């Protein structure tokens, strides 16, 4: 008997499933375990994990181990199928499918902010509903094209200063 299970974390909370990981955000690191039980001593299982993207009929990766891990970094759905063959047989039995769905990347930036110290819109940063962003780098330029600020942490942003001093109200450009 087998109980194939996927182990992963969302917001540092350990999770597990034996059927679907739905609408997760990239990057998502998942460990797949076959979890065999009640296998007699004369039986030697050979494991085969097949990773297939939705819309394809051929796996993009096959792993031959009882436990395997993969980091999902692209949006879309992937079927992870476990096949098991016994005692050097070439006929593998399909045991289970675990489907992993990664959401499409989403990044929204505000079109204005007011760094006046009132606690409302004081920092120019990505809106909180960002999803599946693997790499982030933003630059702020003044109207003459001079870079005045940049940051790489998607959860931080620009406070409206340059070299420690508040910049003049006006139009600034962001490149993400």
Language-model features, listed with the residues they occupy:
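Short loop/turn motifs at secondary-structure boundaries
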Residues: 32-36, 100-176
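Extracellular recognition modules
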Residues: 81-85, 173-175
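Short, solvent-exposed loop/turn segments at the edges of extracellular beta-sandwich modules
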Residues: 85-92
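Solvent-exposed loop segments of extracellular immunoglobulin-like
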Residues: 37-53, 134-135
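Extracellular interdomain linker/stem segments of modular secreted and single-pass surface proteins
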Residues: 1-7, 75, 99-109
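Hydrophobic beta-strand residues of extracellular immunoglobulin-like
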Residues: 30-33, 47
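Solvent-exposed segments in extracellular or luminal domains encompassing
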Residues: 59-79, 157
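Short, solvent-exposed loop/linker segments at the N-terminal edge
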Residues: 19-28, 40, 113-120
């Amino acid at each position: 008997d087998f109980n194939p299970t996927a182990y992963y974390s969302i917001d540092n909370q350990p999770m597990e499933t034996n059927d679907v990981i739905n609408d997760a955000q990239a990057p998502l690191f998942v460990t797949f375990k076959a979890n065999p039980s009640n296998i007699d001593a004369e039986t030697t299982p050979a494991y085969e994990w097949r990773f297939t993207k939705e819309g394809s009929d051929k796996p993009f990766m096959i792993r031959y181990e009882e436990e395997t891990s993969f980091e999902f970094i692209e949006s879309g759905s992937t079927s992870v199928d476990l096949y098991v063959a016994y005692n050097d047989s070439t006929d593998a039995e399909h045991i289970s499918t675990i489907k992993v769905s990664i959401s499409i990347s989403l990044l929204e930036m505000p079109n204005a902010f007011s760094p006046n110290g009132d606690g409302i819109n004081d920092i120019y940063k990505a809106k909180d509903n960002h999803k599946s962003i693997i790499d982030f780098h933003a630059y702020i330029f003044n109207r003459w094209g001079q870079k005045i600020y940049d940051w790489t942490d998607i959860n931080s942003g620009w406070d409206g200063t340059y070299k420690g001093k508040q910049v003049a109200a006006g139009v600034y450009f962001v490149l993400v």
